[in-house]
């Protein structure tokens, strides 16, 4: 009598054991592809200052003079950046757009102290803050040239006439009479409305400087944004003594073009746009949002999955490649295991059961035949 034997375990697992080593491959790749500290020269001074950054103590100044940045040529918070085989001094200051004017020791006015330090870095010369606010314009020196040195009366006349040109005006000596010329071009200045001390609104700080030059009076910035009366200056000098006479026309053109632009929203709109910048148009009462890449919606609250992302640089490309390889291997392993279970295992069970049934049927028939013969 043949006893029934329980079917053996799925033999497909034995076949699939050969693919288990593939699961260890991603871990191996991660171990091999660990970020290795390069022996090349660091790209900036900040790399040497980070705890996990470059070890700059092993560099010899005498052996790497070509690649080391001389502190005498890159001062005032500048950073040495290696581009190819040369090293240059880079001044990358993250200055905000706050308008807090300061006057530098070089006689130039800057939007705030950060821009003053950036200019000192670019010029590689020391620039100190002389006073808060814009610099007062330089007046004529009054020193006569070689032509007028012999005539004290002529020199005194020219000095007193040129002294009236202030607030950025230049003295035109070639004219028949001495004119104060305002050679200030604001056509390339960005739109940033401001309220001036004369109670009028201007499209940018350059127009305030131009109006101060035209009127020959001190006009300063009082606040960001337009004044409460929301008026824009369109007047020109009353005495008509200046060379430029198109100030009113230019102001009107700038006012018309400004209506098509957007200005930043006031502070009470902070948080209006979740992933973007809040902008306010002159013709619109409600603000609008300029969403960042990858976001959409009225408040930039929705994720836009249709955005095509730029391929990363060579530094991060190896990590993207490793991630892609790992993902591909994992998908392949899963597919192999699924196919092995769904196809190989049922087929092996069917063959094994058929053999058992065949053997059992033959033994039973033989027993019955021998009984009949007896």
From Swiss-Prot:
Q: Where is this region: Required for shedding?
A: 303-320
Q: How does it sit in the membrane?
A: Single-pass type I membrane protein
Topology Cytoplasmic: residue spans: 342-374
* Residues of the EGF-like domain: 261-301
UniProt source species: Mus musculus
Task: Region Disordered: list its residue ranges.
Answer: 353-374
Q: Where is the signal peptide?
A: 1-40
**What subcellular compartments does it reside in?**
Membrane
Record key words, sorted:
Disulfide bond, EGF-like domain, Glycoprotein, Membrane, Proteoglycan, Repeat, Signal, Transmembrane, Transmembrane helix
Q: Where is the composition biased (Polar residues)?
A: 356-374
What protein name applies here? Tomoregulin-2
- Transmembrane stretches, start-end: 321-341
Which of the residues are on side Extracellular?
41-320
């Amino acid at each position: 009598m043949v006893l029934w034997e329980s079917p053996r375990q799925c033999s497909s697992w034995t076949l699939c054991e050969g693919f288990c080593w593939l699961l260890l491959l991603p871990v191996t790749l991660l171990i091999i592809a660990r970020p290795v500290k390069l022996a090349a020269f660091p790209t900036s001074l900040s790399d040497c200052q980070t705890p996990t950054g470059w070890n700059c103590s092993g560099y010899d100044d005498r052996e790497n003079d070509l690649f080391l940045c001389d502190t005498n040529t890159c001062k005032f918070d500048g950073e040495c950046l290696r581009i190819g085989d040369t090293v240059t001094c880079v001044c990358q200051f993250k200055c905000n757009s706050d308008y807090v004017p300061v006057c530098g020791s070089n006689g130039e006015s800057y939007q705030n102290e950060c821009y003053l330090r950036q200019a000192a870095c670019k010029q590689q010369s020391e620039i100190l803050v002389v006073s808060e606010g814009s610099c007062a314009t330089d007046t004529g020196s009054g020193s006569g040239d070689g032509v007028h040195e012999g005539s004290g009366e002529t020199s005194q006349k020219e000095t007193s006439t040129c002294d009236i040109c202030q607030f950025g005006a230049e003295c035109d000596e070639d004219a028949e009479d001495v004119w104060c010329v305002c050679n200030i071009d604001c056509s390339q200045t960005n739109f940033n409305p401001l309220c001036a001390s004369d109670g009028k609104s201007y499209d940018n700080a350059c127009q305030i400087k131009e109006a101060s030059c035209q009127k020959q009076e001190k006009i300063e910035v009082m606040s960001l944004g337009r004044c409460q009366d929301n008026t824009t200056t369109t007047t020109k000098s009353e005495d008509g003594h200046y060379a430029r006479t198109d100030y009113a026309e230019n102001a009107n053109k700038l006012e018309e073009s400004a209506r098509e632009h957007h200005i930043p929203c006031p502070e009470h709109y902070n948080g209006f746009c979740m992933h973007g910048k809040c902008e306010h148009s002159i013709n619109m009462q409600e603000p609008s949002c300029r969403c960042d890449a990858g976001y959409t919606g009225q408040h930039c609250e929705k994720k836009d999955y249709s955005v095509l992302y730029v391929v990363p640089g060579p530094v991060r490309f190896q990590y993207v490649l490793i991630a892609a390889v790992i993902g591909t291997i994992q998908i392949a392993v899963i597919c192999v295991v699924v196919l092995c279970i769904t196809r190989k295992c049922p087929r092996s069970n069917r063959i094994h059961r058929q053999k058992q049934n065949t053997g059992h049927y033959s033994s039973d028939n033989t027993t019955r035949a021998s009984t009949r013969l007896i």
